[in-house]
A protein has these predicted regions:
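Terminal alpha-helical segments
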Residues: 1-185
Length: 185
């Protein structure tokens, strides 16, 4: 049986699928065009940094946590917080662009459509320009973080590797910095 790929991966490879899903989300009012809102953009960017700061704090203070609760790790929550930091940064960008997305997947779809879909070749996507492009790798970062967040949130296991938590945190830091740079333009 063929393993089903996440939608965001399909969108990166197939612009027709991206366009169809984007239009379907709009028709269902999951994605709505709204007036651009810099105040809402700022609120979500502040929340992104808030979540990222606490995720960093949790990793840095793991030894202190272990003094209180022996051998307990919270790397699952680091992954969750790092993903939500990325999600709020994505929402900040959407509010600036004049979009509201009702689901996490619709948020990623809108990012792909509005920020990634402006170029003809994948190689061209690597640069940020005045048309607010995100690279394919940055879309992958939030997509992978979403998958990790789902595993960390819904898995019965509490043991997640420090390396996976730190990788998600690093992805979140890069993604949020990129969004912050875009919002400052």
């Amino acid at each position: 049986m063929k393993e089903k790929r996440p939608r965001w991966q399909l969108w990166l490879e197939n612009r027709t699928s991206l366009h169809k899903d984007f239009e379907r989300y709009k028709k269902q009012f999951v994605i709505r065009k709204i007036e651009s809102s810099l105040p809402l953009s700022k609120i979500h960017m502040d929340k992104a940094f808030h979540n990222l700061d606490f995720a960093h704090f949790t990793v840095v203070n793991q030894k202190n946590i272990n003094r209180r609760v022996e051998n307990e790790t919270y790397y699952d929550w680091v992954i969750v917080m790092a993903y939500y930091a990325m999600y709020h940064a994505a929402m900040a960008l959407l509010y600036k662009l004049g979009y509201k997305a009702g689901t996490h997947l619709a948020t990623i779809c809108t990012l792909c459509k509005e920020c990634l879909g402006k170029t003809l070749e994948k190689k061209d996507i690597e640069n940020i320009s005045k048309i607010l492009e995100l690279s394919e790798e940055e879309i992958k970062e939030i997509g992978r973080a979403k998958e990790r967040r789902e595993r960390a949130s819904y898995s019965g296991s509490v043991s997640f590797e420090k390396q996976l938590a730190e990788m998600t945190l690093d992805d979140a830091q890069k993604f949020i910095n990129k969004i912050a740079d875009i919002l400052e333009e």
